[in-house]
């Protein structure tokens, strides 16, 4: 596994169906998309950075890349359902309900991003990009089964305040 990939993401990937379809939302440089492809998942990586997407496609031609403005454009996945959705270090609240709708029958959502309190460590500091306490939990609680949830201060890979969640449509999830 790549040392740059999130340990939280690595921990819960086994819950996604082997060879399943996975969306890496706001994928950035593709650290998780590349890992997913390496593990045999069918990956779609979406981001607004064309250069990063081109680099991902060059490194792993099997990854479907999509250039999209997730905050200013329309949601490109209305007709799609994924076995897994991975989101790290990204928050645009209007997408949260759309992510839940984009999960397949037994889909798994693995989410990790910054929360209130992170401003003391640097960026992001804008409240629009910081989850409130228990916010991810509150969003999914009535629609998914929560496998794991954490929030608080971390020191690795750098000091930050984060919120992490893994949830699934399965009512009887197996633990990794």
Residue spans for each PLM region:
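Conserved SAM/SAH-binding beta-strand->alpha-helix loop
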Residues: 49-51
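Conserved SAM-binding strand-loop segment of SAM-dependent methyltransferases
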Residues: 61-73
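Conserved SAM-binding loop
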Residues: 56-57
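A short acidic, Gly/Pro-enriched loop at the edge of an enzyme's catalytic core
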Residues: 75-84
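Conserved alpha-helix/loop element of class I SAM-dependent methyltransferases that forms part
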Residues: 2-19
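Conserved class I S-adenosyl-L-methionine
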Residues: 20-28
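Conserved beta-strand signature within the Rossmann-like core of class I S-adenosyl-L-methionine
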Residues: 106-115
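Core SAM-dependent methyltransferase catalytic element
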Residues: 154-176
